[in-house]
Amino acid sequence: MTRTRTVKKEKISVASEIDRVEERKLQCKNSLERAEFRKRKQQLSDDDRLALEDEMTILNERVEKYEKDLQVLRGENRRNMMLSVALLAISALFYYTFIY
């Protein structure tokens, strides 16, 4: 099962993976904002307040995790772009050296 999941994950482009992670991060931030708004505006019992704070802690951890994932993905995207530029430069060099 993990093999098929890995194969599917490899077929996804880095740019689409970045978009997906950014969307999830945005959803978590929106949920966090709603939770903070509820905490400020509503009179909550101690149990509800603790549950809300736990939820906010979990959401903050998820946002941090997504930010780390984005940082890694952007680095990978940057590396892929540099590799593409290098291949283009080498191709142009060979073209002008041997064909032109």
From Swiss-Prot:
GO CC, one annotated term: membrane
Domain of life the protein comes from: Eukaryota
Primary localization class, coarse: membrane
The UniProt record lists the keyword Membrane: yes
Coiled-coil blocks: 14-81
The protein's name: Coiled-coil domain-containing protein 167
Localization (cell): Membrane
InterPro entries attached to this UniProt entry: CCDC-167 (IPR028194)
Keywords: Coiled coil, Membrane, Transmembrane, Transmembrane helix
Transmembrane segments: 82-99
Membrane topology: Single-pass membrane protein
Transmembrane keyword on record: yes
